[in-house]
């Protein structure tokens, strides 16, 4: 994405409000066999390439509880009690990255909001991340990813598992890395 000089002077014009998140032009959104809509590779994507960047407003857990009632899940946790996502129905679509969960993901988080390809990805593959790399919450859900290594049940506490910490070393959200470091 090329940003004009006027956008640098006026950051509000850099990205239209309907596009709070970035999705690579090599990806498209369509119906997913996992759940709802998903993100899919429209062209081959190389390992390490940026696939999407989560955007939106930053808010605390209390605000999350308030907006989740009407907007459903649309946020990503970025710190102990902070999240990034939409605050209104008008922001929801533009803040989505449409990355469903998989126990064998092909994209992973770098830092807090940037998602990169974990391996070379072929056209047509759904672009998924393991929610254990971004979430610290109390939820529990049945997993429908279909991977041979599927955990069957995914929880907001899966980041605590040593096997997943090892598997996703370098691709855990910053705040989870800090929590793990403090516990060591």
Task: Locate the predicted segments by residue.
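N-terminal cationic amphipathic segment used for targeting or macromolecule association
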Residues: 5, 12, 39-40, 115
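Short, basic, low-complexity termini and linkers enriched in Ser/Thr/Gly/Pro
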Residues: 1-17, 184
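C-terminal SET catalytic tail plus cysteine-rich post-SET Zn-binding segment of SAM-dependent SET-domain
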Residues: 101-184
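Catalytic cores of histone-lysine modification enzymes
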Residues: 19-107
